[in-house]
Amino acid sequence: MKRHNVNKAPAIRAVTSFIMASALFLSSSFGASVAHAETKTVSYEHNESVDGKISDFKKMVAEGKDLSDKLVIISTNDVHGAIQKYPYVASLKNFFKNELNADVLLVDSGDFSQDKNPEHNNEDADSASCMEPSEGLAGVEAMNAAGYDIATLGNHEFESFVKLDKNLSKAKFKVICSNLVTKDARTELETAEKNNKNDNNALMNTFNSLTEKDYFCAPCYTYNSSKTGIKVGFFGLLTGEANINNISAKKLKDSLALSCAKYQINSLGDNGADIIICLSHLGLEDDRGDHQNRSIDIYNAVKNDPTYKANYPLDLVLDGHSHTLISSGGNGEPIMSGKYMLQYAGITIIGKDTDGKAKIEKSVLVSLDDMKENLGPDEEANATITNIINSYNPSFFGGTPEKTSKEKKSNRSHSDSKRRKSNWARLRWNRKRRSSRSRRAAVIRWRTWRNAEARTRRRSGTKS
């Protein structure tokens, strides 16, 4: 079990970063480091075992075994623009689907719209640097190509350059987030919280009065596996550090996060979910201010706290945000996260016990290196994603970078301006030239007339 300092870049620090960078504007490198990376402390004890081995699953295939009665969930988090690695995740999904005959879901816990690069104190970051040129769209396009089924939102989906509404309209996967609501819904919930401090049931009733229109996107999603008969309910939670600046929705106050989780779990359970999973972009960092809203805090509250205890168990938390490698909690809590940049992926296998009750049979992490060595990339996904990268940043593969739409527009404007200036200069020059020609012609005519007059006078003996 380990405790860590981890590097990450919360967008909510943008204002602080700007102030510090302004005060120390002569030291631009300092400002950049503040804006893009911070050292966060994770003192929560957890396990980092990478027990998953592709070779073990290949051995099952060789022995004629399969997972036809299982639901397999492959999970990722905090990809941060490393979309060139998605073909390996697609290959992992297709391996379980085609070779082991399992029903497979591919899910993500957020931060798929922003790049991370080494110059921002992320030494092992290797983004394809397509997010800003594409306004975040490359992340969604690559996830479509990889075959994602469900994702929640991270704080970096709300970067100022990201066109989130436009991008999500092109997503072929479900997007869920339960604590991102309309302004009116947030006011209603905050009022209910204030007026019913000692009555959490009243707050649950207020949550229950909300409809899907009161949320930015669907708060939850239930997958009904027709192949296995297992129903899995998912809900998403967004960190309070998100700086919502590119959409009209509002995130709930941190004090409402526990109640929000409790309501979603109860709602999913009431609607028949056998297994309930939180796609969490909360992380495990220590500094949460007055409200402890780490993923482990949510899990412990809905399990043990009399106020927030849910009617059904929270079976698994697939976490993101703090870039932590975690296979399980220090006390066996079912929390899993694959660090970041697709360095690891989670594999969760759900089956049924002898009584026919759904249960999680195994949750393990596998490394990207293992996927590369034993599976290789999915060819179709690789071709599509290579084209996506070439569209926005061909220099990644050694080509000439294509200009962004803003650069193209700027260049067009500059070119138009130069052309207009050139045309105006040419017009003025032509006018001058025509005027000059006219003057020269007039002088020539006058000289011709004068010479003719002089010759006439000489012949007649008249002096000029």
Roles of regions detected by a PLM:
Residues 38-371:
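Acidic, metal/ion-coordinating pockets
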Residues 16-28:
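Bacterial N-terminal signal peptides
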Residues 352-412, 416-418, 426, 432, ...:
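A short C-terminal boundary segment appended to hydrolase-like catalytic domains
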Residues 25-43:
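Sec-dependent signal peptide cleavage junction
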Residues 420, 428-437, 455:
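Compositionally biased, intrinsically disordered low-complexity segments enriched in Pro/Arg/Gln/His
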Residues 424, 429, 446-449:
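Tryptophan (W) side chains
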Residues 447-451, 455-463:
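Compositionally biased, low-complexity flexible segments
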Residues 1-18:
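Bacterial Sec-dependent N-terminal signal peptides
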